[in-house]
């Protein structure tokens, strides 16, 4: 998935975040606010599934700038959705990026757009 950054009307081309080889077929995504926010919560669920609730944790959140552009004033809901799911003693830092690197399931690490990528570091106290 690549974020559509713009349209070049002169040569009738699309400008994407990340490489899209010439001649490739693309599909356009239609954004849904609630599904984007729910997706962030699901990412948090996957991240914390092996972390006991009593552990202190640091969540590093990397969200695609495309999500910020789409969600606008609702962007805080994305962060809140992750913190609602993560263990209660979690502190979170993060930033917006133009591409997120993360494995998907058992696949190798790949470049993604339009994702919320979380890394959780925890320790028992």
Role assignments for model-derived ranges:
Residues 1-125:
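Hydrophobic alpha/beta core scaffold segments
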């Amino acid at each position: 998935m690549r974020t559509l950054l713009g349209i070049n009307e002169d040569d009738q081309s699309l400008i994407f975040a990340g490489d899209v080889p010439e001649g490739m077929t693309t599909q356009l995504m239609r954004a849904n606010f609630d599904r984007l926010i729910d997706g962030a919560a699901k990412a948090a669920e996957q991240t914390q599934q092996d972390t006991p609730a009593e552990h202190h944790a640091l969540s590093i959140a990397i969200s695609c700038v495309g999500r910020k552009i789409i969600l606008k004033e609702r962007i805080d809901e994305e962060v809140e959705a992750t913190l609602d799911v993560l263990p209660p003693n979690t502190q979170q830092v993060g930033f917006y990026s133009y591409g997120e690197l993360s494995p998907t399931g058992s696949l190798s690490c790949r470049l993604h757009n339009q994702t919320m990528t979380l890394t959780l570091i925890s320790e028992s106290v």
